Structures are given as structure tokens and as C-alpha cells.
Amino acid sequence: MPLNCSSLATKVPHTLGGLKTTATTTTIHVGGGGFFNLFSKTHQNNSLYIASLSLNKRNSSQRYCLSSSSSSSFVMEDTKDMVFSTLEPGKYSKELDIAVRAVQMACFLCQKVQESLISKTTSQLQAKDDNSPVTIADWSVQATVSWILSETLGSRNVAIIAEEDVQTLSKADSAGLLEAVVQTVNDCLAEAPRFGLKAPGTSLGSSEVLEAISRCNSTGGPNGRFWALDPVDGTLGFVRGDQYAVALALIEDGEVVLGVLGCPNYPMRKEWLSYHHRYHRIISKLTPPTSESWDKGCVIYTRRGSGEAWMQPLIQGHKKLVWPNSATPVKVSTIENPALATFCEPVEKANSSHSFTAGLAHSVGLRKQPLRVYSMVKYAAIARGDAEIFMKFARAGYKEKIWDHAAGVIIIQEAGGVVTDAGGRPLDFSKGMYLEGLDRGIIACAGAKLHEKITRAVDASWNSSSL
Ligand SMILES: Nc1ncnc2c1ncn2[C@@H]1O[C@H](COP(=O)(O)O)[C@@H](OP(=O)(O)O)[C@H]1O
Ligand SMILES: [Mg+2]
């Protein structure tokens, strides 16, 4: 129903992502002494794109959903079941700003290490207890991000749960490795002013670096605030010169409130996501970035309840990060027809059953070949509208870790998509290190229609699968 009202508005300049916006709080008086408080934001281009509305009327708990593409008329639907964000506008802005800068720095660090890994041999690889490769980049990113968050937000205010521990690195026979990590961290932190952050007064010593890594010892859980960090997600992709991600999320009282995903090798053209990394490197070399363009790499970020997700290019060469660094909004794809949809899954069939997803793809009418990509770059692909579906069905008994999903999930949700387990329930980030209670697998989709088709297909085929 169209809304006719006389209103009283206060305008506040506001920035979340790339475009300058004006945030307006409007009080709309209605009959019976009640009033609405409307929070809306208007872009420079005059499009109103997000609004929240609360009705303050005695004996009423109704909530409403507004949608509008221009600032003059609203379409209002009753949506009693819809949960609106209760976040104040601007909440977590400082944390988001710092997190994006920290992830930009982490991407810069990773790019340097990956380049040297590819040009050298595998001498910089070290086997973890589970035999997965871990590199200098994992520890260096963890130390760098931990140090930045502690310095800027105060170490007493910062709790971090992260993938790496210091055991291997602290061993007597790891002195060379530790030295390389300390050097990498200091080289990166020396560049902090380029990213709008303060560099340490003097270089960090090995004990400070070990301290920064081991400070990431939060166990997560349902209460309070903690960061979840995957310093290099998709380590296998990283060591192969392929896709990987740096993932940082802020979780408060069990809910993800901020997500920042750095994808240093995300190609400018989505078709290149499916190219073998060697081709991509050749193409990158043939088309060097000009001062106006960037050939790969982005940081995507969002804040819970904002209804928007943003993408910044990585800063190139010796340039400075000027906030928000040419950020552009990202939105999920509008494709609903399975025949036109692209689905992503892990490269490694050990991480997700390719045969089960092939069966699902067939039964819902997906026609394209799966897009197999390492790491949380798959979440980025959905949020950017470059693919429509991400499915992961790990073997029975495997427990998904929160840092492998938190940032990607919130980014897809705020970009307009849907992410649940295969039973249609939200992923639960409140149970510590693992996504406890996850039903069968993870399904992320650009839209609810595709999502429903896939969850139904899972139900229909699960019992006859070997999973
Ligand atoms: N057996 C297994 N089943 C499912 N996921 C696994 C797995 N072993 C490792 N993983 C997770 O899958 C992530 C890689 O994702 P993908 O397969 O999509 O590239 C790994 O992140 P790390 O590389 O950070 O350890 C790890 O957390
Ligand atoms: Mg990971």
C-alpha cells in the first residue's frame, strides 16, 4: 500500500561502503498516537536502497518491509515474520574500517609470498600434523592481523579464533622458518601507513610475533565478541598459485556481524575463474594493469543488516589506500532458471562429494559444468553475481570450522543471497570452533527459488547416497 504521510526528517551524512550516502531518520506520525521510525539511505544517484522501519505503537508488534527504487514512493508489505536488524546505523564502523585495511594488508603479504613460492621451489612449505601444507603466509597473516587488531582496538578488547597455532613455529628446529615469518611480518607492517594504519615504532622481534599468533586463542562460543580469522583459506590453491582467500569475521553473541573476504587472485573476468591458474598468470602478464585498471584481486565486506556488500580492488603497486578505495556494491545474480545457473564446489573431491552434487545438479536441471574453485572465493563468486550456487557435502564425520564460512556467509546474505545447511537452517556460529549441528551440507544460493529446489533434491536423494 502506498504510504502517504507528513514527516519530520533528520539527515545525517553516512558512509558504509563506496558511495556517499545520506542517512535519513524520519518520524512518521500515524493514527492512534503511534509513529514509525524510518531509517533510510539515499545514494548520490538519488536511489533509495535500504530502509528499516519500526512501528512504535502501543499493543503492536507489527513489522513492515519497505522496498523502493526511488526516494519518493514506498511499497509496504506486512512481513510479521521478517527479522529486522536492530543494529544502530554505523555500529561496528570502526571495526569494519580496520578489518578491511587489515585484510588489504594481508592480501598484499600473501601476493608477495605466493609470487616467491611460485618462482622458487617448495622449500617454504612445511607439513602440518594433518599433512596439509602450511606456508609462511599463514603464520605471517595471522600475526599481522592479530597485531593490527590489538594495536587499533586495544588488546584487551580483542579476542580472535584462528586456524594456526605456534607449536610448529616455536620448535627449536623451526628457527629458520620463524625468522622468515618475522621478516615477512615486519616487511608487511612497515607498509602499514599506505593502508592508513600505524606501523610499529620498531620492528617486531620473534617473541612479539609468536605472541601475536598465540593471542588468537579464543574458543568462540555463544557470548561476547570475537573475531574469526582464516589467514589463508584454501592453502592448496595458494601453494598451487591458484585461488585462495583471507577471511575475517566479527561474531557477537553467536551472530556474525561483520564479514571481510580478501580474494587476491579473483580475476577481473569471471570466465577466468575456471581457467587453470597457469593460463591466468600468462594472461595477467600479457595484460599488465594500467594505473586506471586492476587485473585481479578484491576485498569484499559487509555489515549485518546493512543490506549491502561492497567490493574494493586491492591496492596496486605503491599506491595508498584512500577509503573506500573505489568500492562498488556487489549483488547476487538474478538468475533463477537452473539451466542458466552456475554452481561452484571445492576442487578437491576429498572436501566435498563431486558425485553427490553431480546427481543433484542433474535432478534440478543444472546444465553447466561445475565451477571448481579453491577456498571461500566460491562465496565471493556468489556474492558478486558470477555464480548462483555453492554446495559443499563433506564426508560423514568431518566438522566444518567457523572461520571457513563466517565471512562468506554474511557477505552472501547481505548481497541478497541465501545460505543454510541442507536442512534449510542457518549455520550456527555460536557453538565454538565448529559449525555444530550442521545438517548434511552447506547450500548457498543467489535466490530462494534455487535454494528451495536444491534442498528438496537433497532430501529426495540423500538416503540413496553413500554419504
Ligand atoms: N576432509 C575435508 N572435508 C571438508 N573440508 C575440508 C576437509 N579438509 C579440509 N577442509 C577444509 O576445506 C578448506 C578448503 O576449502 P576448499 O576445499 O573449498 O578449497 C580448508 O581450508 P584451509 O585451506 O584453510 O585449511 C579446510 O578447512
Ligand atoms: Mg580454511
Task: List where the protein language model places each region.
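Oxyanion/phosphate-interacting regions
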Residues: P2-C107, E115, Y275-D295, L314-N325, ...
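N-terminal capping segment at the start of a domain
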Residues: Q104, F108-S132
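Residue-level signal for inorganic ion chemistry
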Residues: A106, C110, D138, L149, ...
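N-terminal assembly/interaction segments in proteins that build large macromolecular machines
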Residues: S123-R225
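Multi-pass membrane proteins that catalyze or facilitate reactions on polyprenyl-/lipid-phosphate substrates
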Residues: L169-P193, W310, P324-S326, E336-L340, ...
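DPxDG-like acidic metal-binding loop motif
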Residues: S207-E211, P222-K296, R303
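Short polybasic amphipathic segments
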Residues: G307-P313
